[in-house]
Amino acid sequence: MPSTNGNDPCDEIRIARNVGTVRCGVSLHAPVTLEELASEFGLRSIKFDEIDSRAGHALAQKILHADLAHAKEVMSKARASELSDEFLKLFGPKARFFTNGNFHQTPRSMSGFTWTPATSATFDTGILIVSGEHCGCLWVEDED
């Protein structure tokens, strides 16, 4: 689906987040199970936790803004917000969001973030998106 400037939002995301690996796209199939959606984007079949829309949007912005390994800025917060909003609007206001950890939260202790790996990367997280018409994925992988 085209963005406002004629480019695919996922292409723009991949260009702007020029570190690690980015898995981004809209499913080629009608709404499916989370397991099938994860598989379509090359993710392992794990337990994905549902998060609310606000957390889903915040996580999308966070993983575009900085890398997972060292929290180094990859792009400005404004650009990350713009790109994540552009991608997520493809799914509408009733979209549901699923993730593999707590990267969307502020760490409550020195132990930091926890997650269940969905790839073989050292660090990975993102969102699987399910809506009435489309499903999709925005997932990043980083190495230490």
Language model: regions and residue ranges:
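Short, surface-exposed coil-to-beta transition loops
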Residues: 120-125
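Glycine-rich, aromatic-bearing surface loops/beta-hairpins
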Residues: 126, 131-141
